[in-house]
A protein has these predicted regions:
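Acidic/histidine-rich catalytic neighborhood of metal-dependent amide-processing enzymes
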Residues: 103-148
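Acidic/His- and Gly-rich active-site-bordering loop/insert found
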Residues: 2-97, 106, 110-121
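Membrane-interface loop-to-helix entry segments
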Residues: 99-101
Length: 148
């Protein structure tokens, strides 16, 4: 069963490339958080921004008893100069998404779109974690209490 439409896939690619062009270091992911929040809003998913400074947490709640699952994507880029020559290469000097976090964000937004339409029972918590690259973002997400 193919549940990822061509349109959703293309939208995920656009999101990934947009984030890739404008990478942000740990705890500076404000533009990335705004993109995430807007995309989730478009899907009808309420998100809480500013978690662990620049993180975003959202919940897909079916109102039906079932398992609670958390899905996580890291958001931050690293301090390295991109020299790929890609049309969507980083426009920020000395900062790049070399670890794929731009793709992780796009994929979690895509998963959210699918789950919002297909989840029948239980809940899914969507965690967009800042500062994964050694800056303690995961600990700050845990301390926020939003995963309780």
């Amino acid at each position: 069963m193919n549940i990822v439409s061509k349109e959703l896939f293309q939208h995920m690619v656009r999101i990934r490339r947009q984030i890739h062009k404008h990478p942000e270091l740990g705890y500076q992911e404000e533009n990335t958080a705004a993109i995430i929040t807007e995309e989730l809003k478009r899907l009808g998913i309420k998100a809480t921004a500013g978690i662990a400074k620049t993180g975003v947490v959202a919940r897909i709640d079916t109102k039906q008893t079932g398992p609670v699952v958390a899905l996580r994507a890291d958001m931050d880029a690293i301090a390295i100069q991109e020299e790929t020559g890609l049309e969507f290469a980083s426009e920020v000097k000395g900062v790049m998404h070399a670890c794929g976090h731009d793709g992780h964000v796009a994929m979690l937004i895509g998963a959210a779109a699918i789950l919002k339409q297909s989840l029948k029972t239980g809940n899914v918590i969507l965690v967009f974690q800042p500062a994964e690259e050694g800056e303690g973002g995961a600990q700050k997400i845990m301390e926020s209490g939003l995963l309780e």
